[in-house]
Amino acid sequence: VPDAQSQWAELLLATLAEAGIRDAIISPGSRSTPLVWAACQIPSLRRHALIDERSAGFFALGQARVTGAPSLLICTSGTAPSHYYPAVIEARQSGLPLLVLSADRPFELQDCGASQTIDQAHLFGGYARYFELGTPVAERAAVLGLQRMAWQAVAAALEAPRGAVHLNFRAKKPLEPASLITSEVTPVLRPARSGYRWRPAPPTQVSPEDLAELTERWTQSRCPLLVCGALSLQDSPSAELVARFARLSGAIVCAESVSQLRFQLDPSTADVAICDSYDWLLGSPQWSKQVAPDLVLQLGAPPLSAQLGRLLEDTPGLELWVCAETGWPDPLLQSARITRACPTELLLALCRALEARSPAVPSTAQRLWRDAGTRVRQLVDAQLGRAFGEPEAVSRICSRVPAGSLLVLGNSLPPRLVDRYCPAAARRLRVLSQRGTSGIEGLIAGALGAASQAQCPTTLLCGDISFLHDVGSLWAARSEHTHVPATGWPLVIVVINNGGGRIFDQLPMAKQAGDHQRFWTTPHALDLRGAAALYEVGYSRASDRETLRIALESAYARTDVSIVEVVVDADSARARLSAVAAEVDTYLRGVLSAS
């Protein structure tokens, strides 16, 4: 049927938009022409152009981390969609909705040496739901099927467990719509229906049996901990609810920065034990033995802190409960129970149950954790004031991130340094991280995608190797390609340049590797201003407290993308870690001997 293919594509894109798709990230190619042209006909669809599919994939995930909704990726055939694979895996592991719409060659060109043709069916294996869209047919049943698959794809991306969905569109030549050549085009494919009524399932409620048992355990515990690991903006409970639960239960709250709670909770709140120094406290063997918890409730992903991990693994008699709507976030295999519930719903139910009982009386353990945590934070701050290095740089950067803004943390050292050196504070920061697979790929692209939706200043804090790994994603910073600069808000990319991947210097292998250590740390002597010049974004360099202050003030005064390169000594993080740990251990030994 003449022009049926273009009308098929237009109907598909219109239905996806009706189902809630608001952003399309398009990578160039010929076979995807019907899809791209169709996307350009929908006024409600914001279109972004990225030449690299890997960057496009993580740009879409950055948007999803902020909005909770899937964005649409469009690409040509062949190896093009395979570059989405890392983002598709991250979507599955992080529970992020994502739609991939790949163009493909028709069936008759498969397995015969046709150019740019591979087997794209089920390309992403078990990491994505798959829909074969077939070829255009001018029949009502076929049109109904196409519209149903579009709605079903969006629903599948949003239903638990959230993740990626792959739609495969087989296009034949001519790829251009007939309307570009002649005005005499007869509509042959009309919508068979519109307005599907679909809504995601409500949050999972805790079972009465789990609630009764956990309430009983909590009231009997002498030293309960609430551990908050990585949580999305959509899944994290409010700071007010966590504080209410801590007050009612006597829980000691240990919140990682990526939980959304570390920079939302107020540590000065009366009758609430918020300990932001847990990583230092648990680094002391004596503390871990004498003031160890007997009950831990974990919200979100497993904790990033190695000290918390060792506590969960090595403490005799410790009972671990894990709250998870889907998945099995217990890599140490230590949990007594995986309770299927939304974190907010679980805490609300526990609060109601605990309110019916006698109020919790602050225990000796709770007072020790709170008082020691406060003093340890003072010791850490004093150490930071002695010399400028990576820990102090991270602390000062976080303190200057505007209140109420978005902070994107890279992987490797940055999130660990933030948790060690940045105190909890009620600054209303939203914190994004790529903790699904904990890889360094796509960090710049993800931050740019998040910034396109955030409607506030955005800061990416990452290491130099992470930056170099994704430097091509700075293409998305150009206003003619995406909507990022048009937001009018600054995106500040802060790069800690310590000359390589220094987290590997903290591993046991570093002592034996000798000259072979370069295969882990990948040292370099690059100046990052060249990258800024290539992509025409702002740039400044800092190497001490004053130049860092000036660089950040200048970057946040802009309304576009800029890079702040912070040059630090390669060994500063490891050296400061050893010095602070020794001082903290000495202090805690005194506290424990006195108690």
Give the positions of each predicted feature:
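A short, small-residue-rich loop immediately preceding and capping a beta-strand
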Residues: 22-26, 46-48, 66-105, 292-300, ...
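Glycine-rich, anion-gripping cofactor-binding loops and their flanking helix/strand elements
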Residues: 83, 228-320, 425-455, 468-472, ...
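Glycine-rich, acidic loop regions that bind phosphate or pyrophosphate groups
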Residues: 102-153, 255-372, 556, 565
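Active-site diphosphate/adenylate-binding microenvironment
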Residues: 9-20, 27-31, 35-39, 370-455
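Conformationally flexible catalytic loops at phosphate/diphosphate-handling active centers
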Residues: 149-152, 156-220
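Phosphate/pyrophosphate-binding active-site segments
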Residues: 1-4, 311-415, 543-554, 558-595
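Thiamine diphosphate
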Residues: 101, 108-121, 417, 423-595
